[in-house]
Swiss-Prot record:
Protein name: Histone-lysine N-methyltransferase SETD1B
Family named by the database record: Belongs to the class V-like SAM-binding methyltransferase superfamily.
UniProt biased composition (Basic and acidic residues): 1-20, 588-599, 1159-1174, 1329-1343
Compositionally skewed regions (Pro residues) per UniProt: 1454-1464
MF GO annotations: histone H3K4 methyltransferase activity; histone H3K4 trimethyltransferase activity; RNA binding
RRM domain mapped to chain residues: 111-199
GO cellular component: chromosome; cytoplasm; nuclear speck; nucleus; Set1C/COMPASS complex
Keywords: Activator, Chromatin regulator, Chromosome, Methyltransferase, Nucleus, RNA-binding, S-adenosyl-L-methionine, Transcription, Transcription regulation, Transferase
């Protein structure tokens, strides 16, 4: 069917018609026209298709007959039938088949004629292993993209592998990905170097270095030499290809460096903004070096070509020779040919002619022509960029001179720079003229004029391609005139280039659209091209004037105008299009105005910025997407680079007439090859396009380095500039160093600015490498800011110039928008966070609940209030976040950290809320609890924020503090695992997150093992404890922070401390680090301890925070149990008393806080402690039970001055030292007591708490107690608080007075407190109660209180008295442990009666309180044990010990809250009453025992023996020994004992307290941190856990459990009696329900929890974990108090990363463990026969076993009996058949039968040798088992194969001889029969059976074979000399196979 076949009449119509329609018909199938058409219709072209039915050529005499649409014919009566159904006549089955048409797409060859930036598809590999071959390398690279070519370089001399390879990818992305993923990776044992090497210059340099013997493949300098980073290298590499392209195209004129600056200014270079300017790498070739061509490239980048091409960089290396060629051939032609690229080409043509001339002249004319050529290049080119004429006119001379200079540039002659200065002036003038023809600078000296003339000529050439605008401008005055003017001005203003540049900028600003981009490039190039420009001289200015401003924003007329001196040029040169550049330009301009000297440096920074913006510009050629952005940046960058390079004028460049004699002085790096013509900065305007804008020659000025004085300035500036621009570009250190050093080199000899060097590069005039700015700067000569707008840079009238000015605007707008968006995001996020979390609502709710709980003592209420607090905390967090965000701390886009979520980005405000509004007395108490753990700085910030939000926030913060604590406690389990990790992740943000999360968990109720009620109690009490303990800490903090309301502050601080701890960590380096360590490494207390020792108070606070946190972690678990008790105790406490106490405490705390704020952190802590002491004293008076009163008296006896408080802090840190009973003085002596808490309040807290000041400790403890009193006191809690107080009061004493009462109460009161049964039960229950069972609230409260009190001083001290059968009452325990903030010892103690009175005792509670005791008094061994449990084994021990103690305490909340004695008085020698003495004795006993047992471990661990912990631990043994002599223990001694006995005591305590031992996780134990109020004891345990190896802890736990059980059993009666007494006393209190003993598990340390949590990174996460995580996530989302970060968290399904495949049991079967963990890495090793026997015996035993079961499993057949019957039947059948046929037939029958019914067999490891074949079903005798299958081969082949197999290392022989001629080879192919091993006593035999004339080997059973019995036969090898050992192990084994 031919369209032309249509009739003549139709042809006119049809050809088109047919063509289209028929084509459509062919393509889509013919659509029949429903109606036949006439020929007229055909003529009407209505037909869609036609067919030539009759062709006259085929049928003579006939006319053509067409059929249209299958129906109409061209002739009326054609006689041909129409088509019935019009359809596509083609055979569907043929034409529907799609044939892949693979048309080869021609690939552009990258050679010297390649125009435009070379795509960075070529990757150079270095340092490859010499075993890597092309195939391997290709396979390695294929994964990143299609590989077009792979070449490995070999030494031509010896063909040795040079370790260098070239890989050309099909795509830029593939090359980049390969470099990204393969660079600095280990391949075949070598760390390989991969970089983008666009033109292979780096590779060739490597090649030369290696072939010449300078380096070996492994010593080859790759990273630092070339480019510090592959990225930098990539940029140069990209630039290099471009350079080559440019240089080849442009000719030699585009030297890698010298022309590079301009070429970068040109579109090429600008596109290559990522590429370092020519100065960056002295030569473009030196891409690898820090100074990548990028540095020189900047100018070229300014031009559209340059930036893209990065040619300039290449040019540098290429030198004049390369340039001339390219210049002549490509650049000139391309430039002239491409009007659009006039800019680049203009410079190119300039360069081309120049290069041509230079090639010829350069050498001849070094002075003037070089100068002129540089000018022509820089100025001329710039003009060319602006007006082709100038570019062309100047260009020839410039190029000629420059080109030779380019070679010189390669030589790095500095003489050139001065010349280039002259030219620079000229070029500037030209550029300026183009920019503002109106202001051509007056002609300078004749030489200048000559230069100008030459420039004019060259530019004229370029003029044709040049931009008309530039041309017109240039035409306004003759090029010569303009050049002369420019030169004149430049000379006159050589040193005023900065100001001139400003004017230039102004001029360019007129042409800003072009000027911006070209100017950006050009300004620097002008500097480069002429030292004048660099020097901020008038001449430079005229040049700028000549140049049009291409930059988005008009370039500053003067350097001052430029935001950053030199930046304007860079920006403009870089690219007007780049908004960033534009933005930078204005800044640079301003800076330039401000600092002309800075111009050079600034320009360099601009270049850096450009590079930063587009780090890949050089690398990509920026053909990739990067290029587009980079090009603008590149332009500026190039400009900057050029500027830096400029200082090094190519020797060929004639120095600008004015000055820079020093040019020769500059030690130029190897001469920069003339920059590629496209380097004209003006070309930058269209940075993306490689071609420079037409008529825009490279800026000549760029080629001239500024005078030395300018360079020095540039040098310094370059540092800055590089910092900025390259910073964005990721300048490598080496890159910067080299750039600066080279610049410095140039500076020394040249007066040119760095930008001069760059412009020289652009002008291709720089014979020298651009010297690093530092070189010039090093000169110390301030360079006047080089004209930011190099004359070379200003493109002719490019529209892009206009864009450039807009770019600045756009950038500004973008910045504004970004700021607004940030603000909006901040606002919205904060609002959302606040709304979602509803902190305020939650806080209010919590406060309400808390008040209700206090009033009603209802755990639920306390829990509710706790929830409220949680909400408040959340709100507080939110407010803090908002505050910190508002402060602009880090909520930029980067600040927001959207990637990691808000909590990562938002510095979740420290929860150390400094809100000063105490909602109420209770809140005041809470505020007191605020941990002073925040660093002062953080506190200040927080306080400021808090103050801002003070009204709301303070309430919230209070609530938040409580809420946080509450949340934490419920989330304890999470906290233990996750909170720390959260904290570690982002202490600030994550803390709040944690709190929110915990709160949510609590709300969800999923996290807390305890009932919500218990949790609520525990939470509330814990929170209260936490609040109190942290409150104390926070009071200290608040004092520092000026927390007006101690209560609110404390509440907030408490909650915020946990979150703020993290924030503090972030805010304060030391504190942050320490806190982070504490949070993250609570178990690594010693770490923080070291830090803390340096900062006692800060660390103390941190310890508090940490302790609180950890305690919170544990508290949530523990306090869930203990909180109810606490709540009950608290509730028991009269609200009035509590409120009074709280108010007092709050007031004092506020005062203390004010003092603290005034004072240093340490002092404030002390003051707060004093106040706290007073408060505690008040509390003692208010709530002190006789016991507690005594204790308080003791405390009171010990004054608690500020110093004491300070000392108390120290003590808190010092509790580590363990001292015997007589050690009270030691306590008073400064002792470094490290809390054993996981956080290691003491250990971690830098400050060393000194036990010297018992008063201080007492005060602190007292204060804590008051705080606790302020909050509704659960019995255990109060007891804990009092115990803490007492402990604090007398850390060293056996028992503080309160401790004595506690002990007594423990012995008696505790019994009274807890019903005897309860006590007994509690002891047992506590022990029995696991962490799970044990009401978390009680222990928690203890923990919380302990945290609040002093972390170590936990209200929740385990209330188990050492001697008492019943757990020590919280009071006794509390008294026992001095309240040392951050020390495990400080636990508020309350008289058992007070704490426990009226409050039903839950075993967990008492248990929880028990942990408090361990702090100061070993008197309460059981309590310390609980404490220890909390510390060492927070969950188990704490619960155990606390259960007994805290049960007692909880069950009998003491009516009088015991103010914990000042923590500072842990060592007061307080003689306890008889009970107290007993407790003391017990403590002493425990202490001694623990000291002996644990002192080493404790001190070794670096954990201070926690008095509370230790004391609690001892209580059990003391309980037993209470009956024995009782000796007072010094608080410190007790602490030491406790600390030492953390493990041992914990054991003893647990023994003493069956409940604790039972595995009930003491809330105190749960929190590892002393900071946790309930963790006082726990804190001790935590340190122990942390300090003591897990095994030891476990052992200790076991021992403790045993001891506790023994002690419990021994003292059960006494305890029961005491419990009965207590029960009688507190019979009114509801008795805690008996909790069935739970399995006791050693509580995991936070570290362990975190390890488990983060194990997903190692072992992955499975579906189950993901399911529960998702459930938890959903629940959290459903909670009103959800964490803020949940808003930013989306649940995205992710496949499980831990897919557990059934474990292979081979190794378990006896195979060895691979030493290296990888079998492959160990090679082959033989399995010892003994090892084999292990599993072989198993197999044999299995085989020997009756096969019934196995048979049933393995054989689908019937049971064995039926199977046997079947076998028998088959045998009978065979026998019958055998009677009819011969043996052969029988065998054949067997064979066929085998095929019909195959035996079930399997192969597995054999005890005989390697693999064996085993029966999976019973096989009767004489049955065919399997055929030996393989390849039938002849003997000859078998011999050959045997040898080959041996060579291949195949040790086994699988050849089976069938007969004399045939052998079956099963080595490579076969079946399982090949695995049958030889045996001297086989159970099978082989038989050759002939089947269809083929011989087959069949294995028959020789006897009955059981299931799993190995099938063997006798190989019957012939006897040979070389024996093969037989391993069959049979009795009659022959020993050998042959």
């Amino acid at each position: 069917m031919s369209f032309k076949e249509a009739k003549p009449g139709e042809r006119g119509k049809n050809p088109e018609d047919h063509g289209r329609k028929q084509a459509a018909s062919w393509m889509n199938g013919m659509e029949a026209a429903n109606q036949p058409s006439t020929s007229a219709e055909k003529k009407s072209h209505h037909w869609r298709s036609y067919k030539l039915i009759i062709d006259p050529a085929l049928r003579k005499g006939q006319q053509k007959l067409y059929r249209y649409d299958g129906l109409s014919f061209s002739m009326p009566n054609s006689g041909a039938p129409p088509v019935d159904s019009v359809r596509d006549p083609r055979i569907g089955r043929i034409w529907t088949k799609t044939k892949e048409l693979d048309l080869p797409v021609p690939k552009l060859k990258i050679d010297e004629f390649y125009v435009g930036p070379v795509p960075p598809k070529q990757v150079t590999f270095a340092k490859l292993n010499d075993n890597i071959r092309e195939n391997f390398l290709g396979d390695m690279c294929k994964k990143y993209g299609e590989v077009e070519e792979v070449e490995i370089l070999y030494n031509p001399k010896n063909k040795k592998h040079l370790g260098i390879a070239k890989v050309i990818f099909a795509t830029v992305k593939g090359a980049k990905d390969a470099v990204k993923h393969l660079h600095n990776t280990s391949v075949m044992g070598n760390i390989i170097h991969a970089e983008l090497d666009t033109k292979g210059e780096t590779r060739m340099r490597f090649y030369e270095l290696l072939v010449n013997g300078y380096y070996t493949p492994q010593t080859l300098p790759v990273g630092s030499d070339l480019d510090a980073s592959p990225t930098v290298n990539e940029t140069p590499q990209v630039v290099e290809p471009v350079k080559r392209t440019k240089e080849t195209a442009v000719g030699a004129s585009v030297t890698p460096n010298s022309s590079t600056p301009f070429s970068h200014d040109t579109a090429y270079s600008s596109s290559r903004q990522g590429t370092p300017n020519s100065y960056s790498q002295f030569t473009p070739q030196s891409q690898g070096t820090p100074h990548t061509p990028r540095l020189g490239t900047p100018f070229s980048q300014d031009s559209s070509y340059s930036s893209r091409q990065t040619t300039p960089a290449f040019h540098y290396g290429q030198d004049s020779s390369f340039k001339p060629r390219r210049h002549e051939n490509k650049f000139t032609d391309a430039y002239n040919r491409r009007p659009g690229h006039h800019y680049v080409h203009s410079s190119g043509s300039y360069r081309g002619p120049e290069n041509t001339f230079n090639v010829t002249r350069p050498q001849a004319e070094t002075v003037q022509f070089p100068r002129t050529p540089p000018l022509s290049h820089s100025s001329g080119n710039n003009k060319s960029a602006f007006s082709p004429y100038q570019g062309s006119t100047v260009f020839p001379q410039t190029d000629d001179n420059q080109y030779p200079q380019t070679s010189r540039d390669m030589e790095y002659r500095r003489t050139g720079p001065p010349t280039s200065d002259s030219y620079s002036d000229g070029s500037l003038e030209l550029k300026l003229v183009k920019e503002k023809p109106e202001e051509p600078p007056p002609p300078e000296p004749d030489s200048t004029t000559e230069q100008k003339a030459s420039f004019a000529q060259t530019p004229e050439r370029c003029a044709t391609p040049g931009t008309p605008t530039l041309e017109a401008e240039m035409q306004h005055d003759s090029l010569d005139t303009r050049i002369a003017m420019l030169l004149k001005e430049q000379r006159t203003q050589l040193h005023l280039i900065s100001s001139d540049q400003n004017s230039d900028s102004e001029i360019r600003m007129e042409g800003s659209p072009i000027s911006s981009s070209s100017s950006q490039l050009s300004p620097i190039p002008p500097y480069s091209s002429s030292s004048h420009y660099q020097d901020v001289t008038p001449s430079s200015r005229p040049s700028s004037t000549g140049l049009e401003d291409i930059s988005p924003t008009p370039l500053p007329d003067s350097d001052d105008d430029e935001p950053i001196p030199g930046t304007a040029s860079l920006c403009q040169n870089s690219r007007s299009a780049s908004p960033i550049d534009q933005i930078n330009q204005p800044v640079r301009k301003m800076e330039t105005l401000d600092n002309k000297e800075l111009v050079v440096g600034d320009e360099t920074p601009t270049s850096e910025k450009m590079d930063e913006g587009h780090p890949s510009s050089g690398e990509d050629m920026e053909i990739s997407d990067d290029e587009v952005t980079p090009s603008p940046i590149t332009s500026a960058e190039c400009a900057i680079t050029s500027s830096s390079v400029i200082p090094i004028l190519p020797p060929g460049f004639p120095p600008l007439p004015p000055p820079p004699p020093p040019q020769s002085g500059f030690p130029m790096p190897p001469p920069l090859p003339p920059p590629p013509p496209p380097t004209h900065p003006s070309v930058t305007v269209p940075p993306p396009p490689l071609p420079a804008p037409p008529g825009v020659p490279p800026h000549h000025i760029l080629h001239h380095p500024p005078p030395y004085h300018h360079f020095p300035v540039m040098q310094g500036e370059m540092m800055n500039v590089l910092g900025n621009h390259w910073g964005g570009m990721t300048m490598s250190f080496q890159m910067q160093t080299q750039m600066l050093s080279r610049m410095m080199q140039g500076q020394g000899s040249y007066p040119y600015h760095h930008f001069m060097g760059g412009s020289m590069q652009f002008g291709n005039q720089l014979p020298y490498r651009p010297f690093a700015l530092s070189a010039h700067l090093s000169r110390g000569q301030p360079w006047p800011p080089l004209p930011k707008f190099d004359p070379s840079v200003p493109p002719p009238g490019y529209e892009p110039k206009k864009e450039d000015p807009h770019k600045a605007t756009v950038d500004g707008v973008l910045q504004v928008i970004v700021k607004e968006l940030k603000a909006i995001m901040k606002r919205d996020l904060n609002r959302k966070m606040v709304e979602v979390v509803a902190f305020r609502a939650f806080d209010e709710w919590w406060d309400k609940k808390e008040r209700l709980a206090k009033q009603s003592l209802t755990p639920v209420k306390s829990g509710e209030s706790k929830d409220e607090d949680k909400q408040k905390t959340k709100e507080h967090i939110t407010s803090s976040l908002l505050e910190s965000w508002n402060k602009g701390e880090g909520l930029g886009f980067e600040g927001i950290g959207l990637g990691i979520g808000l909590r990562g980005a938002i510095r979740l405000p420290s929860f150390k809320v400094k809100r000063k509004e105490p909602p109420d007395a209770a809140l005041a108490g809470d505020q007191k609890r605020i941990r002073p753990s925040h660093s002062v700085d953080d506190e200040d910030e927080e306080s400021e924020r808090d103050r801002d939000i003070s009204g709301t926030a303070s309430d919230l913060s209070k609530k938040d503090a409580d809420a946080v604590n509450i949340r934490r406690r419920p989330a304890r389990p999470l906290d233990s695992e996750g909170e720390e990790e959260v904290e570690s992740e982002g202490d600030d943000g994550e803390t709040s997150d944690k709190e929110a999360f915990e709160k949510e968990d609590q709300d969800a109720g999923s996290v807390s093992a305890l009932s919500s009620k218990k949790r609520l109690y525990g939470e509330k009490e814990d929170e209260e404890d936490e609040t109190q303990s942290s409150g104390k800490e926070e009071d200290l903090v608040s004092e520092e922070e000026d927390i007006t309301s101690v209560a609110s502050s404390r509440a907030e601080m408490d909650s915020s401390d946990e979150s703020d701890e993290s924030s503090e960590y972030e805010s304060s380096s030391d504190s942050d680090d320490e806190i982070e360590e504490e949070d993250d490494d609570d178990e690594e207390e010693e770490l923080v301890f070291e830090d803390d020792q340096s900062e006692e108070l800060d660390l103390g606070q941190e310890d508090y925070i940490e302790t609180d946190r950890e305690e919170d972690f544990f508290k949530e678990d523990v306090s869930e149990c203990s909180s109810p008790v606490k709540a009950e105790a608290d509730m028991e406490l009269e609200d009035d008393d509590v409120q009074k106490l709280e108010q007092d405490v709050a007031h004092q705390t506020a005062q203390d806080t004010s003092h603290l704020r005034k004072k240093d952190l340490d002092v404030p802590l002390v003051e707060s402690k004093e106040h706290k002491q007073d408060t505690f004293d008040k509390m003692e008076r208010l709530s002190a039970v006789p016991m507690q009163q005594n204790v308080f008296k003791e405390h009171e006896k010990a004054p608690s001055p500020m110093n004491e408080e300070e000392e108390y802090i120290e003590l808190r840190l010092e509790p580590v030292p363990l001292v015997p009973d007589n050690a009270p003085p030691a306590v008073q002596e400064p002792m470094i007591i490290r809390p054993l808490t996981p956080t290691g309040a003491f250990g971690e807290s830098g400050p060393v708490l000194k036990l010297e000041e018992p008063k201080l400790q007492v005060n602190l403890a007292h204060f804590v107690a008051e705080d606790e009193d302020l909050y509704p006191r659960t019995p255990g809690r109060d007891t804990a608080a009092h115990s803490d107080t007492e402990v604090t009061f007398q850390p060293g004493l056996k028992v503080a007075p309160s401790s004595l009462p506690l002990l007594q109460s423990h012995n008696k009161e505790e019994e009274c407190l807890l019903p005897p049964e309860k006590h007994t039960g509690h002891l047992k229950v506590t022990k029995t109660l696991s962490e799970e069972e044990l009401p978390r609230t009680p222990g928690r409260d203890i923990l919380v209180k302990s945290s609040h009190l002093g972390k170590s001083q936990s209200t929740e001290t385990i209330p188990a008295t050492p001697g008492s059968d019943a757990p020590l009452t919280g009071n006794s325990l509390t008294l026992t442990s001095p309240h040392i903030p951050g020390s495990p010892f400080s636990y508020l103690s309350q008289s058992p009666g007070i704490i426990n009175s009226g409050i039903p005792r839950t075993p967990g509670r008492d248990f929880n309180f028990t942990p408090i005791f361990p702090e100061s008094n070993s008197i309460f061994p059981s309590h310390p044990s609980g404490k220890k449990s909390s510390v060492d084994e927070p969950d188990e021990k704490s619960f155990k010990e606390p259960t007994s103690a805290s049960l007692t305490m909880n069950s009998v909340p003491s009516p009088i809250p015991f103010a914990s004695p000042p923590r500072g008085v842990p060592h007061m020698d307080i003689r306890l009453e008889t009970d107290d003495l007993e407790s003391s004795d017990t403590q002493a006993y425990l202490s001694d025992k623990l000291l002996s047992e644990e002192s080493e471990c404790e001190f070794t661990k670096g954990q201070l023996p926690s008095t509370d912990e230790s004391a609690p631990s001892p209580p059990f043994p003391p309980t037993d020994k209470r009956k024995g002599p009782k000796k007072p223990l010094a608080a410190h001694e007790f602490e030491a004992c406790v600390a030492l006995s953390e493990g041992a005591l914990g054991k003893q305590l647990f023994i003493g307290q069956p409940d604790s031992v039972s595995g009930i996780k003491d809330p105190a134990a749960v929190p590892l941190d002393f900071r946790n109020d309930g963790l006082s004891e726990n804190t001790v345990h935590d340190p122990i856990i942390q300090k003591v190896p897990l095994k030891e802890l476990e052992n200790q736990w076991n021992e403790v459990l045993k001891e506790e059980e023994e002690d419990i059993s021994k003292h059960k009666k006494s305890r029961n009696s005491r419990l009965n007494k207590l029960y009688d006393e507190f019979s009114t209190l509801p008795s805690p329900e008996y909790s069935p003993p739970r399995a006791m598990f050693k509580p995991r340390s936070e570290f362990e929890e975190m390890t488990i949590l983060y194990d997903i990174w190692n072992g992955g996460i499975d579906d189950e974990d993901m399911k529960y995580m998702c459930i938890t996530y959903d629940r959290l989302l459903q909670q009103d108090n959800g964490m803020d970060w949940l808003n930013d968290t989306l649940w995205v399904y992710h496949p499980p990363t831990s897919v557990y495949s059934p474990k292979k049991k081979k190794r378990d079967d006896g195979l060895r463990e691979h030493v290296t963990g990888c079998a492959r890495s160990e090679g082959y090793y033989k399995i010892d026969k003994k090892d084999k026997l292990k599993y072989l015996i198993n197999n044999r035993s299995l085989a020997d076993e009756p096969p019934i079961d196995t048979q049933g499993k393995s054989i689908p057949a019937q049971p064995q009996a039926s199977t046997r019957a079947g076998s028998e039947r088959r045998s009978e059948q065979r026998r019958l058949l055998s009677s009819f046929t011969g043996s052969c037939d029988s065998d054949l029958l067997k064979f066929n039968q085998l095929k019909f019914r195959k035996k079930k067999i399997r192969f597995c490891k054999s005890h005989i040798h390697d693999w064996g074949l085993f029966a999976m079903e019973p096989i009767v005798a004489d049955e065919m088992v399997i055929e030996y299958v393989g390849q039938n081969i002849r003997q000859v082949i078998a011999d050959m194969r045997e040898k080959r197999y041996e060579d291949e290392g195949i040790g086994s022989s699988y050849m089976f001889r069938v007969d004399h001629d045939t052998i079956i080879d099963a080595t490579k192919c076969g079946n399982f029969a090949r695995f049958i091993n030889h045996s001297c006593n086989p159970n099978c035999y082989a038989k050759v059976v002939t089947v269809e004339s083929q011989k087959k080997i069949v294995i028959y059973s020789k006897q009955y074979i059981n299931v799993n019995e190995e099938i063997t036969y006798d190989y019957k090898f012939p006897i040979e000399d070389v024996k093969i050992p037989c391993l069959c192990g049979a009795e009659n084994c022959r020993g050998t196979l042959n």
